[in-house]
Amino acid sequence: GTARSWFIYKKSNPWHYYQWGVFVKGTRSWIHSEMYRGTSNKKLIASTYNGLGTNQTTACIRVQAGNAKLIYDIAKTNRYSIPIRIYRSSNKGPFGKITLNDTTGKIPGNQNYDPTDPAFKNKR
């Protein structure tokens, strides 16, 4: 697809019903984790995790918590805006959905945490 260049920058939010949100300047979009039922990483809405890679919102780019934290940390520690390219493609690139060993890539509907969240690395 046709790529559009944008920038992520320090206007960030560690919590707002998602983890590690970073604003994409020049758009109304944020890059952030899947949705939670509040400001706790133990209140994940499992269906939003299982829906990663599908079109669920009109503006935001949702990624697994581990990738959201990586992007957040890069944006927060960088002095300047960081260029990114957003485009539609079947190639998921480095931020494609990670399927953990011995899993289907989906989580049970009653699971309340993201298995890629660094806070839960011992539960993997």
Residue ranges and their predicted role:
Residues 3-124:
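Exported/periplasmic cell-wall-interacting domains
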